């Protein structure tokens, strides 16, 4: 931990222009990114009386060991570069509004030949379009159940679809008209596509259009005396209206707007956003983040009234949230375009609604409101009405959003008090039990997984402050200690330990020594800046899954590499014994110990991650095809071949000319495929 005075820039060396700056720690990781109208004025604040800094800012300046900056032409450029660097370096002291993966959503797998609609909770995936998020899982399932009456698109998994395709008869949903049964050819690919388009159109907010079309069809059926069809359309309209009733009309003028509000205390901030489309609330989400305190606040900032940090929080949220949303939408659009090009048809003609709405209603005007508006308008490609509602329905809705933010912060604090106390107690107990100099703020654990020596893999999981840091997880295929159906768990532990800490040494050496003391902005520093070198610093505690033999193997690697500042232990599964290097007897923690509970949690997470990877590798090996080893034949072309001929067996019956007729195959590649499938006897 460095004293800020040791890396303070020399007087007069900091420019007075607008710019963006980075603080780095002694491992050269970027730990904070900020922007300023005047770099000299802003950076000087960090090196004044540190006792006057916000607690989190004070922690940051002591964790840092150098500072760099880049001068830009305007405040708008500074705002954009700050967003880019936060995305690139993921600094731990910046406010980050990450997508909450626990929110339930309704998803449509647009990348499949016959897209399906399904309930989903988790990180976003390629080739899938998402609607929501919803506040409750039952709301997603009920909405889907009602809508497939009107839009009977596929909802089954790939396995169920293939099974019924082979059986030649549909599932129950096909018999009760809640699925158009594309698996048995009841509808063509194009007809199913039209159903999906209607579903996506409705979920995108074009509800009036769908209602008008159904009403017109119902009236036409009635006039033609087709009362059975008219009754079915009437029931479909009832289902549509039931879905719409659940999305209460809050703004009667058909407004498309996002409403955003914060609730804060001294250390944290909760933000809620309501998405209103066509006057109805279509989605809601929220985050709780730590405040950085890195803002120029007025001298009377402790006075009663609104939190003076709110404008800064609002600015950061708007730029980060909509920047991420536009980037994600562009990625999804590119995937759709690739799919359209590959299939040769325009599968989804319905226009996707703008990610940045026409109107953004905020609790307070953001800091540098004009610059923020310009950034949002660039993201939208059109004007954005960014304002604080003063009266009427919009003001009432803002108060509702503020109330939700306050409730979210309250519930978070209640939960956090319990969680933080338990984690702190567990880390303290581990420190005392293992006689460590400090509590292990970073813990790493490795585990081996295999079945009778096949597909031998290892996992490395990371916990920081007692919580999993999944972005730092690593997976390894064991190379030296396994093969030919044999596996040595002890040697495998040694191999993983060696590879992990060799990576540590390599990442530490990635930055030349002459740049270690850089406190200015120049081209060399920028060229050597690297994205998150997460293994450039060691853990305080390294856990291996196993007993004394595994610990001894890892300790040999430590001795070989000269690692002396990492505590090494083994956690044996059967009796939950903790083994230390060289000790004849294990450490036994009480069964109700918070320390043991945390160590078990880390070990079990490593086991889960290893098992998952092992299953993936085993499944991959079992899916090996005769086409896999053909030179010049990648995954896309293999898929195209099997799709065209139906199976490898039918492909084997094809001639070179037949193969050359497949899209993307020339005579030379077709000949290679033919020869690979017909080897000389």
UniProtKB/Swiss-Prot annotation:
Q: Which residues form the GIY-YIG domain?
A: 16-95
Query: Where does the record place it?
Result: Cytoplasm
Q: Cite the SUPFAM superfamilies for this sequence.
A: C-terminal UvrC-binding domain of UvrB (SSF46600), GIY-YIG endonuclease (SSF82771), RuvA domain 2-like (SSF47781)
Record-annotated UVR domain positions:
208-243
What are the UniProt keywords, alphabetically? Answer: Cytoplasm, DNA damage, DNA excision, DNA repair, Excision nuclease, SOS response
Which GO annotations describe the biological process of this protein? nucleotide-excision repair; SOS response
Write down the Pfam families for this protein, in alphabetical order.
Answer: GIY-YIG, HHH_5, UVR, UvrC_RNaseH, UvrC_RNaseH_dom
Listed GO cellular component terms?
cytoplasm; excinuclease repair complex
Main localization is cytoplasm
Give a GO molecular function annotation for the protein: DNA binding
Function in brief: The UvrABC repair system catalyzes the recognition and processing of DNA lesions. UvrC both incises the 5' and 3' sides of the lesion. The N-terminal half is responsible for the 3' incision and the C-terminal half is responsible for the 5' incision.
Query: What protein family is recorded?
Result: Belongs to the UvrC family.
Quaternary data? Interacts with UvrB in an incision complex.
Database matches in HAMAP family:
UvrC
Q: What is this protein called?
A: UvrABC system protein C
Query: To which species is this protein native?
Result: Corynebacterium efficiens (strain DSM 44549 / YS-314 / AJ 12310 / JCM 11189 / NBRC 100395)
The organism's taxonomy opens as: Bacteria, Bacillati, Actinomycetota, Actinomycetes, Mycobacteriales
């Amino acid at each position: 931990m460095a004293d800020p005075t040791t890396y303070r820039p020399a007087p007069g060396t900091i420019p007075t222009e607008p710019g963006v700056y980075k603080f780095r720690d002694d491992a050269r990781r970027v730990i904070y990114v900020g922007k300023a109208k005047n770099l000299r004025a802003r950076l000087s604040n960090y090196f004044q009386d540190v006792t006057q800094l916000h607690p989190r800012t004070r922690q940051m300046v002591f964790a840092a060991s150098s500072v760099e900056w880049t001068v830009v032409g305007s405040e708008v450029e500074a705002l954009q570069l700050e967003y880019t660097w936060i995305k690139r370096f993921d600094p731990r002291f910046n406010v980050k509004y990450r997508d909450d993966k626990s929110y339930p959503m309704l998803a449509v797998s647009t990348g499949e030949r016959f897209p399906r609609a399904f309930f989903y909770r988790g990180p976003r995936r390629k080739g899938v379009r998402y609607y929501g998020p919803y506040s409750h899982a039952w709301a997603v399932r009920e909405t889907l159940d009602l809508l497939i009456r009107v839009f009977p698109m596929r909802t089954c998994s790939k396995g169920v679809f293939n099974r019924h395709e082979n059986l030649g008869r549909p599932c129950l949903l096909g018999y009760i008209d809640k699925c158009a049964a594309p698996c048995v050819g009841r509808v063509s690919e194009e007809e199913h596509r039209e159903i999906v388009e209607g579903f996506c159109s409705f979920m995108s907010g074009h509800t009036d259009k769908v209602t008008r079309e159904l009403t017109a069809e119902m009236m036409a059926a009635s006039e033609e005396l087709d009362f059975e069809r008219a009754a079915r359309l009437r029931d479909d309209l009832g289902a549509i209206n039931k879905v719409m009733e659940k999305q209460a009309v809050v703004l009667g003028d058909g407004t498309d707007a996002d409403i955003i509000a914060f609730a804060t205390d001294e250390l944290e901030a909760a933000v809620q956003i309501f998405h209103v489309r066509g006057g109805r609330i279509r989605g809601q989400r929220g985050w709780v983040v730590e405040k950085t305190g890195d803002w120029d606040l007025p001298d009377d900032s402790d006075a009663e009234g609104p939190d003076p940090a709110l404008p800064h929080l609002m600015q950061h949220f708007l730029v980060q949230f909509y920047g991420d949303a536009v980037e994600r939408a562009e990625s999804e659009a590119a995937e759709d375009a690739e799919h359209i090009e590959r299939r040769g048809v325009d599968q989804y003609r319905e226009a996707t609604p703008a990610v940045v709405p026409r109107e953004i209603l905020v609790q307070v005007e953001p800091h540098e409101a004009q610059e923020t508006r310009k950034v949002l308008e660039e993201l939208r490609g059109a004007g954005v009405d960014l304002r604080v509602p003063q009266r009427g329905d919009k003001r009432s809705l803002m108060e509702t959003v503020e109330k939700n933010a306050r409730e979210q912060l309250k519930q978070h604090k209640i939960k956090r008090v319990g969680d933080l106390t338990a984690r702190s107690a567990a880390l303290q107990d581990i420190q005392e039990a293992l006689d460590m100099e400090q509590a292990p703020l970073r813990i790493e654990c490795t585990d081996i997984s295999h079945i009778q020596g096949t597909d031998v893999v290892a996992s490395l999981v990371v916990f920081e402050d007692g919580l999993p840091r999944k972005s730092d997880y690593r997976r390894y295929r064991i190379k030296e200690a396994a093969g030919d159906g044999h596996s040595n768990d002890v040697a495998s532990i040694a191999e993983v330990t060696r590879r992990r800490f060799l990576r540590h040494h390599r990442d530490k050496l990635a930055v030349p020594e002459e740049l270690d003391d850089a406190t200015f902005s120049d081209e060399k520093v920028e060229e050597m800046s690297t994205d998150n070198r997460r293994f450039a610093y060691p853990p305080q505690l390294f856990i291996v899954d196993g007993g004394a033999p595994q610990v001894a193997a890892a300790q040999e690697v430590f001795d070989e590499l000269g690692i002396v500042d990492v505590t090494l232990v083994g956690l044996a599964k059967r009796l939950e014994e903790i083994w230390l290097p060289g000790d004849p007897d294990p450490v036994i923690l009480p069964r109700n110990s918070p320390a043991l509970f945390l160590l078990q949690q880390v070990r079990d997470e490593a086991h889960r991650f290893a098992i998952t990877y092992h299953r993936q590798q085993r499944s991959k090996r079992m899916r090996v095809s005769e086409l896999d080893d053909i030179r010049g034949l990648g995954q896309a072309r293999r898929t195209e071949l099997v799709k065209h001929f139906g199976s490898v067996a039918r492909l084997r019956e094809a001639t070179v000319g037949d193969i050359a007729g497949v899209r993307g195959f020339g005579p030379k590649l077709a000949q290679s495929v033919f020869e690979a499938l017909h080897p000389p006897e």
